[in-house]
């Protein structure tokens, strides 16, 4: 039984003399015309198979049926456009992908008559087509002797490339050669699939300047595939393959616009269902487009070795490639566009292994084959069948291929830049929403004047603190951060600002000898963190305002120091009296209201000094740049929102708020791992004070305190117990 099967298989391999004496030749067709008819029939089968969504295995099987059929029958008796649909209809059933007869007829009509409308299924013409196709199918079956199982060279290509551990580029190139051998040559009628596979691998090696080494036992790689193969046979068939490519008509080298049609159909379907995925799909499309451009660029480039080639390609020797790729891709590209080889049918013996090795090449090459090869339509011209060496072939097309390579590289660069731009936009759009919003009501919210304040709507702080977890936020330097606080106040508020400046000056003088300094002790915890971290110029806060003292020191450890925002906004309100605020902590804290000359102050932070750099906290602040006239400085995501800020905060019950503030600050410091300790007392930072109110007398008094800091007074009464920590 096995011997009988081998004899039957030999029946379908023909010598050159038999090919030259085929039925079509006997009916008057010249050799080139017959080969052209075979190529056009294979082209039609490829197009129909893609439209019917059958696997490439099914299409290849139908092409072999067609080649064998025309070794028994003539093209003059059975037109290729009639045989092709019947062969595909039969192959689909053999490969377990049956298609409805109606669909096959409609697809064939669309491919052959794209301008005409589809026939009515009840019309006489349609019924006649159905009858003709069924009859042709039975004729093909009888002509083939019901030998329907086909062995393809692809199986052997994959096995051999795996055996010799060939590079991915070499495997892909060899695989495409096997497909093109079916489309463009009669090798399937002359040589067994293992021999054809060796020819394809040999041609791919020449193409990519790659040489498969001899095995350890001294055998060449092709001896493991087929013992009858010799190097002379491989060179002869490679030369014949190149000659066929050289004289293949240009119209068969063009890529059918299958990808555009498929993309248009997919776009319509996607529009019905998935608008929400549009942005993600755009990025994915750009990525796939970029990868396909890279592949095509690799195909068109001359590489020294396929192992060093960076892109999957039909590597490089563009010489032979220009022609071969034209037609080769005519077949491989077009079928890949609609059949990414993910569909592996149970009966697809060779495709299961092919998919593992070559799915990347198939999918990437499917996408932009048309761009690469439409431009090659004029590259090769029909020439007499004189022998052309591989070097001559390369030299002939080197210039054209260099131009195509440049064009494809430009296209690849454009696609990559578009992808980068789109990705950057998505990332920036995402980052713009990753912020934490803190609404901080400023004291005076229980002020009797609240109805008036609610009219102004904009005197509470709403701060948007950018998240520091991302790379962008982490890379921002403190000195690059500017702050903007825009306080919209009425005219009477500016009057109150001036009053507060005067009161603060008087209060500072009184406060130096004030007997109730025991409140210093309570404020030490709340001021410790901000004093130790902020530069000298940032110490001018209204620390007597309990809310501000807590908020300033709570946020002082962040790279975006928000303390300036509180000094600016607090300066727009009158200074509370010492007995109401619990006696402000340090002398420098009483100077805060001097910043009220403008509703905001523009400055950028220098690198934060350490405690060692701040002896007595009166160090030089020349590193700070103040710009008094600027009233619109910028702070990231900081807004002013509703909620009241009292123009007069005298009547607010401050004792409870103050204690709550101290407790909250201590809990936050403990959470950060900082143990609050008493810092050395110091005078207010003189640089900023002189900037607002230059006085000669202040210099002498400060100079004495700089070197010898004054110790803080002891509390006259113990602090009250702390309430539980806030959640």
From Swiss-Prot:
Comp. bias intervals (Low complexity): 561-571
GO MF assignments: 7SK snRNA binding; chromatin binding; cyclin-dependent protein serine/threonine kinase activator activity; DNA-binding transcription factor binding; molecular condensate scaffold activity; protein kinase binding; RNA polymerase binding; transcription cis-regulatory region binding
UniProt comment concerning the protein's domains: The histidine-rich domain (HRD) region is intrinsically disordered and promotes the formation of phase-separated liquid droplets that enhance binding of the P-TEFb complex to the CTD (C-terminal domain) of the large subunit of RNA polymerase II (RNA Pol II).
Cross-link (Glycyl lysine isopeptide (Lys-Gly) (interchain with G-Cter in SUMO2)): 343, 416, 482
Keyword match Transcription: yes
Pfam assignment, any one: Cyclin_N
Protein's name according to its UniProt entry: Cyclin-T1
Record PTM ADP-ribosylhistidine, positions in chain: 488, 531, 557
Biased composition (Basic and acidic residues): 487-507
UniProt gene name: CCNT1
């Amino acid at each position: 039984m096995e011997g009988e099967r081998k004899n039957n298989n030999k029946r379908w391999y023909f010598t050159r003399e038999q090919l030259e004496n085929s039925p079509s030749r006997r009916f008057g067709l010249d050799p080139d015309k017959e080969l052209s008819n075979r190529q056009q029939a294979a082209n039609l089968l490829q197009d129909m198979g893609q439209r019917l969504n059958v696997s490439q295995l099914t299409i290849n099987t139908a092409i072999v049926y067609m080649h064998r059929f025309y070794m028994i029958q003539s093209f003059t008796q059975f037109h290729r456009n009639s045989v092709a649909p019947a062969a595909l209809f039969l192959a689909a059933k053999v490969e377990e992908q049956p298609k409805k007869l109606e669909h096959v007829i409609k697809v064939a009509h669309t491919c052959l008559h794209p301008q005409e409308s589809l026939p009515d299924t009840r019309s006489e013409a349609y019924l006649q087509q159905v009858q003709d196709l069924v009859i042709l199918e039975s004729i093909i079956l009888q002509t083939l002797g019901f030998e329907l199982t086909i062995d393809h060279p692809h199986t052997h290509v994959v096995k051999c490339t795996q055996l010799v551990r060939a590079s991915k580029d070499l495997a892909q190139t060899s695989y495409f050669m096997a497909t093109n051998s079916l489309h463009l040559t009669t090798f399937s009628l002359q040589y067994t699939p293992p021999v054809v596979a060796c020819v394809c691998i040999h041609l791919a090696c020449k193409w990519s300047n790659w040489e498969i080494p001899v095995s350890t036992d001294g055998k060449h790689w092709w001896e493991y595939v087929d013992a009858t193969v010799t190097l002379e046979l491989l060179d002869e068939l490679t030369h014949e393959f190149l000659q066929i490519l050289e004289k293949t008509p240009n119209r068969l080298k063009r890529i059918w616009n299958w990808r555009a049609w498929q993309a248009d159909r997919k776009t319509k379907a996607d529009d019905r269902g998935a608008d929400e995925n549009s942005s993600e799909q755009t990025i994915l499309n750009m990525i796939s487009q970029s990868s396909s451009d890279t592949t095509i660029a690799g195909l068109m480039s001359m590489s020294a070795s396929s192992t060093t080639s960076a892109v999957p390609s039909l590597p490089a020797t563009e010489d032979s490639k220009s022609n071969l790729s034209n037609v080769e891709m005519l077949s491989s590209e077009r079928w890949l566009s609609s059949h990414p080889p993910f569909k592996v049918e149970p009966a697809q013996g060779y495709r299961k292994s092919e998919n593992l090795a070559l799915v990347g090449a198939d999918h990437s090459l499917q996408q932009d084959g048309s761009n690469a090869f439409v431009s090659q339509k004029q590259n090769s011209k029909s020439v007499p069948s004189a022998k052309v060496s591989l070097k001559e072939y390369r030299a002939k097309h080197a210039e054209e291929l260099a131009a195509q390579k440049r064009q494809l590289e430009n296209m690849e660069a454009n696609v990559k830049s578009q992808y980068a731009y789109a990705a950057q936009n998505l990332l920036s759009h995402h980052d713009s929403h990753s912020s934490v919003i803190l609404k901080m009501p400023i004291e005076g919210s229980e002020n009797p004047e609240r109805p008036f304040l609610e009219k102004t709507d904009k005197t509470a702080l709403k701060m948007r603190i950018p998240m520091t977890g991302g790379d962008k936020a982490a890379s921002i330097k403190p000195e690059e951060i500017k702050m903007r606080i825009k306080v919209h106040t009425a005219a009477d508020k500016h009057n109150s600002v001036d009053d507060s400046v005067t009161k603060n000056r008087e209060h500072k003088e009184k406060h130096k000898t004030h007997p109730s300094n025991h409140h210093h002790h309570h404020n030490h915890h709340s001021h410790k963190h901000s004093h130790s971290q902020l530069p000298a110029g940032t110490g001018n806060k209204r620390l007597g305002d309990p809310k501000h003292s807590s908020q300033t020191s709570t946020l002082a450890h962040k790279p975006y120091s928000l303390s300036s925002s509180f000094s600016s906004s607090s300066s727009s309100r009158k200074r509370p009296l010492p007995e109401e605020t619990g006696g402000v902590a340090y002398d420098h804290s009483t100077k805060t209201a001097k910043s009220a000359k403008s509703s905001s102050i523009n400055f950028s932070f220098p690198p934060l000094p350490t405690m060692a750099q701040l002896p007595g906290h009166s160090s030089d602040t020349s590193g700070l740049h103040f710009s008094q006239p600027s009233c619109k400085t910028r702070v990231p995501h900081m807004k002013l929102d509703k909620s009241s800020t009292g123009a007069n905060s005298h009547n607010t019950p401050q004792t409870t708020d103050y204690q709550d503030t101290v407790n909250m600050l201590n809990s936050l410091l403990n959470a950060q791992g900082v143990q609050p300790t008493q810092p050395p007392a110091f005078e207010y930072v003189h640089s900023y004070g002189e900037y607002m109110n230059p006085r000669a007398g202040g210099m002498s008094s400060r100079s004495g305190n700089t070197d010898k800091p004054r110790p803080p007074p002891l509390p006259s009464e113990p602090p009250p117990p702390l309430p539980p920590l806030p959640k």
